[in-house]
């Protein structure tokens, strides 16, 4: 990897600033009830291309999936920075994970399908364009058809989930949209615009700790340290294990010279991070990039111990072993990665194993 970024606050689908769409100053905020509104031409397409012959639920779901990606339908393309409303996505034919989920849910409702948004609280993602590793939340949708549930996820192969997805309300999903826009405005140093958007997110879902933590970041960067501290503390009241709030409160304490408070926050943060496989993996990547292979191997092994079913952790450990000249250990770790996979991924691991064993 060429570079590494770990967000200091885990906004949903947090993007590296260079990858974010640049918001227009003074741009009007779309009302919450407009975020998932279907444009009339799109509604007509749903009825003419999906519902025209009154298909059954399974057929409707299959047609909807094809409609979203086929050139004769919407021809949607995944674009990481495309944080858009349903109407904007229809016009641009692009969507990120959040917008794709908003769009799918709106279309599923029009098609008479029972669909629900889901959230994975923490994921580890990798942006191939610039080698950036990032932490965030992730959303997708689940559909119930004939007693079975199907997951609809446009970027499932781009992430490493820590936890299983849990259902969330559509209100929270829409609040995430405003949170994402706030991050774009923050990256453009538009603090007033970011706070206005976070106000909407908080009005929709005041119990979501990450929004308060993000508001604390915006206030602190705008020079309002007292307001930022208040928001961070509120985030911790909602979620005592909110690592973003703890990290930023430790930073505030350090800047104000309160050493004892800084130590307290850093100890709390360290306790959480000791059982966090993503933190171990990030530390390992940092060490590997710095050329510290012994530490990288230790941290990769810790990540593997904490989340042993993640094949990419075993693969990364194998690569570190290989760089350290420990071929036998690399083969063992790669074999474990292979055993945890199937299909094309398993075949790719098999090729790598054959090449190593032939040395």
Tell me what each language-model feature is:
Residues 206, 240, 274-275, 308, ...:
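Short coil turns that delineate tetratricopeptide repeat
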């Amino acid at each position: 990897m060429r570079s590494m970024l770990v967000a200091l606050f885990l906004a949903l689908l947090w993007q590296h600033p260079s990858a974010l769409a640049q918001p227009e100053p003074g741009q009007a905020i779309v009302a919450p009830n407009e975020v998932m509104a279907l444009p009339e031409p799109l509604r007509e397409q749903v009825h003419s291309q999906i519902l025209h012959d009154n298909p059954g639920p399974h057929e409707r779901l299959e047609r909807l999936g094809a409609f979203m990606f086929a050139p004769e339908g919407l021809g949607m393309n995944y674009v990481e920075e495309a944080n858009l409303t349903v109407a904007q996505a229809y016009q641009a034919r692009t969507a990120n994970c959040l917008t794709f989920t908003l769009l799918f849910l709106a279309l599923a409702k029009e098609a008479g399908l029972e669909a629900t948004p889901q959230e994975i609280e923490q994921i580890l993602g990798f942006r191939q364009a610039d080698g950036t590793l990032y932490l965030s939340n992730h959303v997708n949708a689940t559909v119930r058809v004939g007693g079975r549930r199907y997951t609809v996820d446009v970027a499932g192969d781009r992430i490493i989930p820590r936890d299983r997805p849990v259902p969330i309300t559509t209100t929270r999903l829409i609040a995430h949209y405003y949170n994402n826009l706030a991050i774009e405005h923050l990256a453009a140093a538009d603090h007033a615009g970011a706070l206005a958007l976070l106000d909407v997110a908080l009005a929709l879902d005041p119990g979501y700790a990450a929004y308060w933590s993000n508001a604390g970041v915006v206030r602190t960067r705008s020079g309002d340290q007292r307001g930022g501290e208040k928001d961070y503390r509120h985030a911790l009241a909602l979620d005592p294990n909110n690592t973003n709030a703890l990290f930023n409160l430790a930073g505030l304490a350090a800047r104000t010279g309160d050493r004892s408070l800084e130590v307290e926050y850093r100890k709390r943060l360290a306790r959480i991070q000791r059982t966090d496989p993503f933190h171990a993996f990030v530390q390992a990547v940092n060490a590997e990039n710095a050329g510290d292979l012994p530490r990288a191997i230790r941290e990769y092994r810790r990540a593997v111990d904490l989340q042993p079913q993640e094949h990419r952790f075993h693969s990364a450990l194998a690569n570190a072993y290989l760089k350290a000249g420990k071929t036998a250990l690399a083969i063992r770790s790669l074999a474990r990665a292979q055993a945890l996979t199937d299909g094309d991924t398993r075949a790719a691991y098999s090729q790598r194993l054959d090449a190593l064993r032939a040395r």
